[in-house]
Design a protein with these regions (language model features):
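Solvent-exposed alpha-helical segments and adjacent loops
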Residues: 9-781
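Sec-dependent N-terminal signal peptides of Gram-negative exported proteins
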Residues: 1-8
Length: 781
């Protein structure tokens, strides 16, 4: 997944896709006090001689060049940069852009652009061409010879590296003409397509970074780098639960920073990875293969990699696991207070007590939320006759209960350039490309000929004056997944003036007002579980509390490297979902499960090292013995009454199915906790290292995530098979009236029985009343 792009793009809406927004600014951290001098060891010379930190003069540069022998090459396709569809350029002067960035610790020495294009055979060669602009500067002009028209052709262009900065925008501008006479600016023969498999290749020289904590999160993470983050964690081979909790806090912080890029945290021990690495150590738990200085408290330090000066090591240390957790929390919440090569945290204020559903990345569900909180002013404005989409990214709690509701109320305020006359211009509204509704873009009100003439005159005098409009409508909640994008397309009809009179004017503007709101406050939180879609897309139910204070991760008794890597990467995924480090998380093993029985549980391991798989086999929709996999099946025929209300998936399992597979696989499944009603367990099980990696890749692949749903998913490489198995249950609460309606909707026989009883009572009462009245008439009393 990639961030929103194509600002000012002239491609039609089919060329745009739903993309999540970059992460919001980090939450305001609690006060972190760094001891004077910011050193780990009072004897700084000792630390320096042991290769952990080295004192750098304050006037030393933050970056310095590494010898040219360290040159590296890498490339991105346009798809990797966010163009999930080909770029389609239409008209005489359309333009489409793609942003890209260069990490701060690299200098670009060469750039090669490889374009896969196709263009109209009707173009006049001498007048038509494709311009490549980097940050507004002309970088190249590509001719469009007639003999190559009408078919895909590869064009390679070298770009001057001096045009490249940290944050860049590459615009591709099509200049097209089909006649030497008067031409229609939007003639159907004016087209050029650019494949999203086109690529841009960089040759870079790495730069050595100064040992300074003030540069964090660089060089371990650079927001300019659009690649997936891969950051090794170096731990003792038998890391304690407390050390793993500290490591989880740090990985969730980096996961939140990585956002749409995704993050993978391979755990290692024994040999220090030849890469930027995070090292965790206490006085009792010191990883072999790296020198750790004496530790005087919760500490952070950054130093050169002992085996390769191109890389850095970040040391997170404490005398015990409590201090280690303090250091990890301070790193994730108070990094702006650090400077120099090392620091000791002398005080960390109490952390804010979190409330359910208060994740920074999630839309507030207790009040209307303004669009200005979700998108910048620039993102809400467009220009031109074929403007880009206005995109507003939404992250909703996945447990919103919208049964029988009108939908999510949306108050939309927008503005647009007045139309010179009534036409077919419209505002089309989609969610994740799914059509919702449309509204006409009207001209000024016209009551008579005089008013019409005056309106035309005002339009000519004030071409930039925008017409305000307000609409209130509902978004169908069943079409709004946890990760969604509102897409507003201003479709302006180009006015035709006649032969040789059409002139393309760039005076059309439109904007969505920042005061527009989306309101979730009317929806209770209530959801049927298990629901792996909620877990895969939003980390639910664990992310209900953004700090994971009601979550425990149960790792194997003897966890392997794959288990720890999976745990760390999952915590990165949780941080990406909420935007907050998981500083409330608990890590335990099978023997600790009773102590954390009142929490939601994330279960990791395999059939050989996770005893809870056999202990809880009767509660799970999945059990394993060797290569035999057993699944509980629900009776799907009886899940609903087709003539009444909506489907309900709360039937008991009626059968079991056994299957034998020798292929590599991983199983992701959920069930209600055997320890406490209403609590959930999500298990990720695989007997092979590659199986755990497949699960993580699936969770970070937008195409595969959409295939994860139900209560069980089997993942084999790039294949995902999901099914609904076992018992279902509900978490959350409903208002009394809605709860009664929901209960009765699942028991139509009870409604029939109540109607019969009511009819019998009413019949009895009426019989008694009429009998008494008849007796009075007979007796004359």
């Amino acid at each position: 997944l990639f961030p929103p792009l194509f600002r000012g793009c002239s491609a039609p809406p089919a060329a745009h896709t739903a993309l999540p927004a970059p992460p919001p600014p980090p939450p305001t951290p609690p006060a972190v006090t760094v001891s004077p001098g910011g050193t780990i060891d009072p004897q700084s010379s000792t630390a320096a001689t042991q290769g952990v930190v080295s004192t750098v003069a304050s006037e030393a540069p933050a970056l310095s060049a590494i010898p040219s022998s360290a040159l590296r090459k890498y490339s991105f396709t346009f798809r990797q940069l966010g163009a999930l569809d080909p770029l389609q350029l239409r008209g005489v002067d359309p333009i489409s852009g793609i942003p890209f960035s260069i990490p701060n610790d690299e200098v670009v020495t060469a750039v090669k652009l490889k374009l896969d294009i196709a263009y109209s055979p009707s173009l006049i060669t001498n007048l038509s061409h494709l311009k490549v602009l980097i940050n507004g500067e002309l970088a190249a002009t590509i001719p469009l010879p007639k003999e190559q028209a009408g078919a895909s052709v590869i064009k390679e262009v070298s770009i001057d590296p001096r045009l490249i900065t940290d944050f860049n925008r590459m615009n591709l501008q099509f200049i097209g003409h089909y006649t030497l006479e008067c031409e229609d600016p939007f003639h159907s023969s004016l087209w050029l397509n650019i494949s999203n498999l086109s690529s841009i290749e960089f040759t870079v020289t790495p730069l050595a970074v100064q040992n300074d904590l003030a540069l964090l999160p660089a060089p371990f993470f650079d927001r300019r780098d659009g690649r997936r983050l891969e950051l090794p964690f170096f731990l003792p081979p038998t890391a304690s639960n407390g050390m793993l909790e500290a490591a989880g806090i740090v990985s969730s912080w980096f996961g939140a920073l990585a956002s749409y890029r995704g993050a993978w945290f391979p755990a290692t021990s024994g040999t220090l990875p030849n890469d930027d690495t995070i090292v965790f150590a206490t006085n009792e738990e010191r990883p072999a293969g790296v020198t750790i200085p004496p530790i005087s408290g919760p500490s952070l330090a950054i130093g050169a990699h002992p085996g390769d000066s191109r890389y850095k090591i970040l040391y997170v240390m404490g005398r015990d696991v409590k201090e280690l957790r303090t250091a990890a929390t301070a790193l994730s919440l108070g990094r702006s207070t650090f400077s120099g090569p090392s620091a000791t945290i002398s005080k960390l204020d109490d952390l804010k007590v979190r409330a359910p559903y208060d994740a920074p990345n999630w839309i507030a569900s207790n009040r209307p939320v303004k669009f200005g909180e979700l998108a910048s002013v620039e993102d809400l404005n467009v220009r031109g006759y074929s403007p880009d989409l206005v995109r507003v990214n939404l992250r909703l709690p996945p447990d919103l209960f919208g049964w029988k509701s009108d939908g999510i109320p949306l108050h939309l305020s927008y503005r647009y350039s007045p139309r010179p006359r009534p036409d077919k211009s419209t505002l089309n509204i989609n969610v994740n490309r799914n059509y919702i509704t449309s509204y006409p873009l009207l001209a000024f009100p016209r009551t008579d000929a005089g008013a019409d003439a005056m309106a035309r005159f005002v339009n000519k005098l004030l071409p930039d004056k925008l017409i305000p409009a307000v609409e209130d409508f509902y978004l169908p909640i069943n079409q709004i997944p946890a990760r969604s994008q509102l897409q507003f397309h201003f479709n302006f009809d180009y006015p035709k003036e006649g032969a040789c009179k059409d002139v393309l004017l760039d005076n059309v503007r439109a904007a969505i007002d920042q005061e527009s709101t989306v309101d979730l406050s009317s929806f209770p939180h209530y959801i049927q579980m298990p629901n792996l879609s909620a877990f895969a897309n939003a980390g639910y139910p664990f992310t209900r509390m953004a700090d994971l204070s009601e979550t425990a991760v149960i790792i194997p008794d003897t966890p392997g490297v794959a288990d720890i890597s999976t745990y760390l990467s999952l915590m990165g995924r949780m941080g990406e979902s909420t935007g907050l480090p998981v500083y409330g998380l608990t890590v335990g093993k099978a023997a600790d499960v009773q102590r954390v029985g009142d929490k939601d549980l994330l279960l990791l391991g395999g059939t050989s090292n996770q005893p809870l798989l056999s202990q809880w086999a009767g509660n799970m929709p999945f059990s394993a013995s060797g290569q035999i996999r057993t699944f509980s099946l629900s009776d799907w025929i009886l899940k609903r009454m087709p003539w009444y209300e909506e489907p309900r998936d709360d039937k008991k399992p009626v059968a079991k199915l056994s299957a034998v597979s020798l292929n590599r696989d991983a199983v992701l499944f959920g069930f209600e906790s055997p320890l406490k009603s209403g609590r959930s367990v999500v298990a990720i099980i695989s007997d092979k290292t590659v199986g755990m990696a497949d699960v993580l890749n699936a969770l970070m692949d937008s195409d595969l995530v959409s295939k994860i749903h139900g209560s069980l998913a089997i993942i084999r490489g790039k294949e995902v098979e999901s099914m609904t198995l076992g018992n279902t249950y509900y978490v959350g609460s409903l208002p009394p009236l809605i709860a009664l309606r929901w209960f009765l909707s699942g028991t139509p026989w009870l409604i029939a029985a109540l109607l019969l009883v009511a009819a019998a009572i009413l019949g009895t009462v009426m019989y008694a009343f009429l009998r008494r009245k008849a007796n009075k008439r007979i007796t004359g009393k």
